[in-house]
Amino acid sequence: MPQKIRVLIADDHRLFAQALEAILATDDRLLVAGQASDGAEAVQLTLSLDPDVVLMDIAMPVMDGLQATRQIRKQRPKACVLMLTGSNSKTDVDRAREAGAAGYVTKDRIAAELIDAILEVVGR
């Protein structure tokens, strides 16, 4: 049996993070490795837990998701960060890519696209 894909959830909205965890729990290939409530905590947990994928909200306190992604990618160049946001403007997509995000899912499409997006960025 292949090893589970370990996912770190980084979102400052606790209820939304719980909803993400519930979506991920529907797929046996995925395992939630941890949760961060701000960008700085996301960096810290990524370095300590070494998840396969980080689901990163863009708008968070302390440090936003773009800054956190840059820091993660600087210290772990192969880290897979999948951006989650309420916006699907081209500017936000470009900013996410420039920060080093491997992919991008808008919050209105999460239920339909999240698991496929995770599998795509880890190459499974």
Per-region residue spans from a language model:
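Active-site beta3 strand of CheY-like receiver
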Residues: 49-55
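Receiver (REC) domain active-site loop signature in two-component systems and cognate sites
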Residues: 60
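Acidic catalytic/metal-coordinating carboxylates
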Residues: 38-41, 63-67
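C-terminal output helix
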Residues: 91, 109-119
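Short amphipathic alpha-helix used as the core "switch/output" element in two-component signaling
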Residues: 44, 66-77
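Short, conserved "switch-loop" micro-motifs in signal-transduction and mechanochemical regulators
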Residues: 87-88
